[in-house]
């Protein structure tokens, strides 16, 4: 299975939209969209990765 990844180079961003495009993080937490996920990735210093697209 190919590794799934998201480009978070443009983050963090101060404001995320409420758009529902869920992603599942390696912490087994569902993030509402790429912005929320990428902000969390930046805060985790890169330890958080994408598990898969969609809810956990």
Curated annotation (Swiss-Prot):
Major subcellular location class: secreted
Keywords noted in UniProt: Disulfide bond, Glycoprotein, Protease inhibitor, Repeat, Secreted, Serine protease inhibitor
Cysteine disulfide links: 8-38, 16-35, 24-56
Glycosylation sites: 45
Localization terms from the record: Secreted
GO molecular function, one term: serine-type endopeptidase inhibitor activity
Keyword presence, Nucleotide-binding: no
Family matches, as Pfam families: Kazal_1
CDD domains (alphabetical): KAZAL_FS (cd00104)
GO cellular component: extracellular region
Recorded superkingdom: Eukaryota
Residue ranges of domain Kazal-like in the record: 6-56
Annotated site location: Reactive bond 3: 18-19
Keyword Heme: no
Domain notes: Avian ovomucoid consists of three homologous, tandem Kazal family inhibitory domains.
Name the record gives this protein: Ovomucoid
Species of origin: Francolinus pondicerianus
